[in-house]
């Protein structure tokens, strides 16, 4: 499961962006992943603070952005995949928000086909 999360996050351009630590995908190894898994298993895992940065928007305002460490991103992805595997089958077929392969466009298509 961790290898699947690693593979998914590795493809993302943001994988090389450090959070509060200088940790990026380059520093990840099987040994490091095993340490993270052991910390979670024995309830010693601690989330690290998120690095906050402000990105300028076109209208001149700033957009706040939180950048977690790479280890935190990986643990979040594992949790997301576990929760998704459990809850996705229980969702209504007519529900489109925040679901894999669904969104506002699929909702509009369904409305157009039904009505």
Place the predicted regions along the sequence by residue.
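Conserved pre-catalytic core of RNA-dependent polymerases
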Residues: 1-115
């Amino acid at each position: 499961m961790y290898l699947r999360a690693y593979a998914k996050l590795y493809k993302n351009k943001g994988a090389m962006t450090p959070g509060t630590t200088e940790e990026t995908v380059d520093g990840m190894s099987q040994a490091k992943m095993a340490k993270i898994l052991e910390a979670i298993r024995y309830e010693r895992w601690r989330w690290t603070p998120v690095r906050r940065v402000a990105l300028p928007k076109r209208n001149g305002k700033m957009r706040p952005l939180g950048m977690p460490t790479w280890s935190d991103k990986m643990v979040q992805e594992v949790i997301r995949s576990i929760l998704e595997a459990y809850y996705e089958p229980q969702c209504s077929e007519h529900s489109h928000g925040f679901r894999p392969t669904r969104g506002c466009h699929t909702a509009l298509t369904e409305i157009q086909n039904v009505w």
